């Protein structure tokens, strides 16, 4: 993790003086970074689940969770613990191997997507030169896990849910990739850090949401479809397919699908923040942008304070998008399968392609 290089150098020198080998320090640093990221992601998912239950309760004029902890804040943790203790049942006539590895193939690509997300200045696990396309590439693996789960269940509802998941992913990943490519053309980079820094040069009005309004709307719709959220939750439509590819699952494997869904929703929200909303930069309209504030502390303390502020700003923007996603789920009806595919192939794909050509033309003229 790229984080406060002075702190890393001090820790490295301390380890060398203590007689530890260099490889041991690198292993310890990477392990600590991954554990911190995973812990933060898990806490973020628990917060999302609690927010969704409370917001949906408010929309439906209910109270929502209130007994497990203050305001029901640990209700999701209690539900997860209950799933851990439930029996793991494997269908007798299903494919046990596909049935077992399907949930893992769904969760792992989503976790890998967090590697290239900058949560703040110098807060990123892997600053790759192809960061955004790394996300597109690994996210395309998850539908394969859904199809394996549906096929391995030996259940017609599960199989149909897996087929729907693959069709939906293929339909909406292409417009999503075209929108990302338009942002990359504007920024002349595929690195997520470079994209944020390019936006920070021009303050609030330099955000890509103003420079790419058509692409932003297309990205918003495509990301909701990729997350399989209402009105695009066709692979697990309860009224049609019982529970889709999840029908035969129980216990922790059943819970992994829900974890992957909320992890994917958080990933999409963070990428909306990074690609369109200026990332960790706090930009106020009609005022100049100050990416780094000066504090009356030591240089290390000032850098840590700025890093914390950047993380808070990034999460605030991401959770604002999450609020829109949650409200959309509880206010719009589900579309039909043919409407879903028509929206992806006949509307979003031409719009995203036209937006890319328009962006490329302006870049050539400029």
Curated annotation (Swiss-Prot):
<comment type="subunit">
    <text>NDH is composed of at least 16 different subunits, 5 of which are encoded in the nucleus.</text>
</comment>
<keyword id="KW-0793">Thylakoid</keyword>
<comment type="function">
    <text>NDH shuttles electrons from NAD(P)H:plastoquinone, via FMN and iron-sulfur (Fe-S) centers, to quinones in the photosynthetic chain and possibly in a chloroplast respiratory chain. The immediate electron acceptor for the enzyme in this species is believed to be plastoquinone. Couples the redox reaction to proton translocation, and thus conserves the redox energy in a proton gradient.</text>
</comment>
<dbReference type="GO" id="GO:0003954">
    <property type="term" value="F:NADH dehydrogenase activity"/>
</dbReference>
<keyword id="KW-0934">Plastid</keyword>
<feature type="transmembrane region" description="Helical">
    <location>
        <begin position="254"/>
        <end position="274"/>
    </location>
</feature>
<keyword id="KW-1278">Translocase</keyword>
<keyword id="KW-0520">NAD</keyword>
<feature type="transmembrane region" description="Helical">
    <location>
        <begin position="130"/>
        <end position="150"/>
    </location>
</feature>
<feature type="transmembrane region" description="Helical">
    <location>
        <begin position="29"/>
        <end position="49"/>
    </location>
</feature>
<dbReference type="InterPro" id="IPR001694">
    <property type="entry name" value="NADH_UbQ_OxRdtase_su1/FPO"/>
</dbReference>
<feature type="transmembrane region" description="Helical">
    <location>
        <begin position="340"/>
        <end position="360"/>
    </location>
</feature>
<feature type="transmembrane region" description="Helical">
    <location>
        <begin position="166"/>
        <end position="186"/>
    </location>
</feature>
<dbReference type="GO" id="GO:0009535">
    <property type="term" value="C:chloroplast thylakoid membrane"/>
</dbReference>
<dbReference type="Pfam" id="PF00146">
    <property type="entry name" value="NADHdh"/>
</dbReference>
<keyword id="KW-0874">Quinone</keyword>
<feature type="transmembrane region" description="Helical">
    <location>
        <begin position="307"/>
        <end position="327"/>
    </location>
</feature>
<dbReference type="GO" id="GO:0048038">
    <property type="term" value="F:quinone binding"/>
</dbReference>
<protein>
    <recommendedName>
        <fullName>NAD(P)H-quinone oxidoreductase subunit 1, chloroplastic</fullName>
        <ecNumber>7.1.1.-</ecNumber>
    </recommendedName>
</protein>
<dbReference type="GO" id="GO:0016655">
    <property type="term" value="F:oxidoreductase activity, acting on NAD(P)H, quinone or similar compound as acceptor"/>
</dbReference>
<keyword id="KW-1133">Transmembrane helix</keyword>
<feature type="transmembrane region" description="Helical">
    <location>
        <begin position="202"/>
        <end position="222"/>
    </location>
</feature>
<dbReference type="InterPro" id="IPR018086">
    <property type="entry name" value="NADH_UbQ_OxRdtase_su1_CS"/>
</dbReference>
<keyword id="KW-0472">Membrane</keyword>
<keyword id="KW-0618">Plastoquinone</keyword>
<keyword id="KW-0521">NADP</keyword>
<dbReference type="GO" id="GO:0009060">
    <property type="term" value="P:aerobic respiration"/>
</dbReference>
<keyword id="KW-0150">Chloroplast</keyword>
<dbReference type="GO" id="GO:0019684">
    <property type="term" value="P:photosynthesis, light reaction"/>
</dbReference>
<keyword id="KW-0812">Transmembrane</keyword>
<comment type="similarity">
    <text>Belongs to the complex I subunit 1 family.</text>
</comment>
<feature type="transmembrane region" description="Helical">
    <location>
        <begin position="97"/>
        <end position="117"/>
    </location>
</feature>
């Amino acid at each position: 993790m790229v984080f406060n290089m002075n702190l890393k150098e001090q820790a490295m020198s301390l380890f060398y003086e203590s007689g530890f080998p260099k490889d041991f320090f690198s292993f310890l640093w990477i392990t600590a970074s991954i554990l911190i990221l995973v812990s933060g992601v898990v806490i973020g998912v628990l917060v999302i689940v609690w927010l969704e239950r409370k917001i949906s309760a408010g929309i439906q004029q209910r109270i929502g969770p209130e007994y497990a902890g203050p305001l029901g804040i640990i209700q999701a943790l209690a539900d997860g613990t209950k799933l851990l203790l439930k029996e793991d049942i494997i269908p007798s006539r299903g494919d046990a191997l596909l049935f077992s590895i399907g949930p893992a193939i769904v969760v792992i690509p989503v976790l890998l997507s967090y590697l290239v997300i900058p949560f703040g200045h110098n807060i990123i696990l892997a600053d790759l030169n192809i960061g955004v396309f790394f996300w597109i590439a690994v996210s395309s693996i998850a539908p394969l896990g859904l199809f394996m789960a549906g096929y391995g269940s030996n259940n017609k509802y599960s199989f149909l849910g897996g087929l729907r998941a693959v069709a939906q992913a293929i339909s909406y990943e292409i417009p999503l990739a075209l929108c990302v490519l338009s942002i990359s053309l504007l920024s002349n980079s595929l690195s997520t850090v470079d994209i944020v820094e390019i936006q920070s040069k021009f303050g609030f009005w330099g955000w890509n949401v103003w420079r790419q309004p058509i692409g932003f709307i297309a990205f918003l719709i495509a990301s909701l479809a990729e997350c399989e959220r209402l009105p695009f939750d066709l692979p697990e439509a309860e009224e049609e397919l019982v529970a889709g590819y999840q029908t035969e699952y129980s216990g922790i494997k059943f819970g992994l699908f829900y974890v992957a869904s909320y992890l994917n929703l958080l990933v999409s929200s963070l990428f909306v923040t990074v690609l369109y909303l200026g990332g960790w930069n706090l930009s106020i309209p009609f005022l100049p942008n100050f990416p780094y504030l000066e504090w009356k502390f030591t240089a290390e303390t000032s850098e840590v304070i700025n890093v914390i502020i950047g993380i808070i700003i990034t999460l605030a923007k991401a959770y604002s998008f999450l609020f829109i996603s949650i409200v959309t789920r509880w206010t719009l009806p589900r579309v039909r399968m043919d409407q879903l595919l028509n929206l992806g192939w006949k509307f979003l794909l031409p719009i995203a392609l036209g937006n890319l050509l328009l962006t490329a033309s302006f870049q050539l003229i400029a």
